[in-house]
Amino acid sequence: MVLASNHSNIEIKSDIPLINSMESYSLDKNMSNSIISTNLNDFSNWARLSSLWPLLYGTSCCFIEFASLIGSRFDFDRYGLVPRSSPRQADLIITAGTVTMKMAPSLVRLYEQMPEPKYVIAMGACTITGGMFSTDSYSTVRGIDKLIPVDVYLPGCPPKPEAIIDAIIKLRKKVAQETYRDRTKNKRENRFFTSNHQFKFVPSIHTGQYISDQSSIPLLDLPLERTISEMRFDNKFFMNEEELLPKGRK
């Protein structure tokens, strides 16, 4: 790689003929500070440091803190973060908020649609451990690391925008130290979609026999004429005036 400022100071000899509009000149001592020697792995990591495009994924109040990064006060564009709405164009997903059992398959589907290499930041206590819903909630996932691999954990309820920037900087350091084998390694191994919730199933009291079978009518101890004359409307029963009168006064 040759810097443009140093390349402009190189004197080109006019007596050397040009071949295909390009000149080949030998390297001298003046160009020793103009060349950066590196390998393909480090060059790829350097290029990806400023192109981490996050996927907009917010399910709770933590996303309000993440949205404040877009403003001019914090300005996360200086780190090369461009919010994307499609998982196929994103390199990073920041899970901000509570993840429920119903939302878990959608989160896994979004993660699988992201191209490799991809990264995950778990933002907030509800995302990491379930937060205040982890004790008595039957529908909250106790940590998204049961669903997808997490690279950076960001605790807080909710975390400050400065903490989000610090997590992004730590992720950039991790990206800079990666190798090709680390990027191509399957991160989905030993991952499972399960839960420790214990559901107790009880038999239903609604058998449906009152609709399909007439054998349930004698159990009500009601006359057949009274059952036929009843009209059900909005879970209320309406009867004739004769049935409301006491016996012997009809």
From Swiss-Prot:
Cross-referenced SUPFAM superfamilies: HydA/Nqo6-like
Cofactor: how and how many bound: Binds 1 [4Fe-4S] cluster.
Membrane topology listed for this record: Peripheral membrane protein
A single BP term in Gene Ontology: aerobic respiration
Subcellular location: Plastid, Chloroplast thylakoid membrane
Its biological purpose: NDH shuttles electrons from NAD(P)H:plastoquinone, via FMN and iron-sulfur (Fe-S) centers, to quinones in the photosynthetic chain and possibly in a chloroplast respiratory chain. The immediate electron acceptor for the enzyme in this species is believed to be plastoquinone. Couples the redox reaction to proton translocation, and thus conserves the redox energy in a proton gradient.
Protein name, per record: NAD(P)H-quinone oxidoreductase subunit K, chloroplastic
Organism for this UniProt entry: Angiopteris evecta (Mule's foot fern)
